[in-house]
């Protein structure tokens, strides 16, 4: 696995005139969205999907922002690892809620992992590393009490590897009750979650128009508190040069994935900041 630097251009708040075109309390992002197949965390496996899912969903744990090698709790309050038994005993945060208002339960975690493994979509191979598959997943996840569950795995991996796997987007926790209300033909709510959300992230889905835009609105009941922004508008702008133009005109606050020519043209411009953000990437030699 390597790290790739993804250029990100931010129109800084110091340029008030440039910001006049964007709505207050709203972040406008320009990027390509044509690669998106689904925003269901059990299926999302494209760059634009993976960039969006963490705003809508949380995992039990996640890498520390300043030290990615360290795993920190999110929906989990704490955990105990038993390497010999290949088991994690996880206590959930008792006050965590989904955007629907439903409280987080062990059943939601069990449902989330079970549906991801059973649906067996593109990113399911990540959970398969634990030895989980549709034939054994039911025996690997057990509720202990209203705020505790145990996770067992069969593969020969350490608890630290298991925790890293549980920090990936496919391990996002969905609201079982909300998803169950939108199941069709035993699809675990997959068709509905392609374009809706049922998570506990800082934002929830307001509308998704494929190949056009994604609009997110603040989740006021998000664990950790509501975000400062009221909404995020992600516009589909396939052409990098057009993304650059939106930044220059003040019609976007952020432009993702600009090429070297666009970065060179904007570097040093008043009110514009170039950020290079490390991103995990897998490369295969065939």
Predicted regions and their residues:
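Gram-negative bacterial Sec-dependent N-terminal signal peptides
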Residues: 1-19
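Ligand-site clamp/hinge motif
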Residues: 191, 219-265, 276, 280
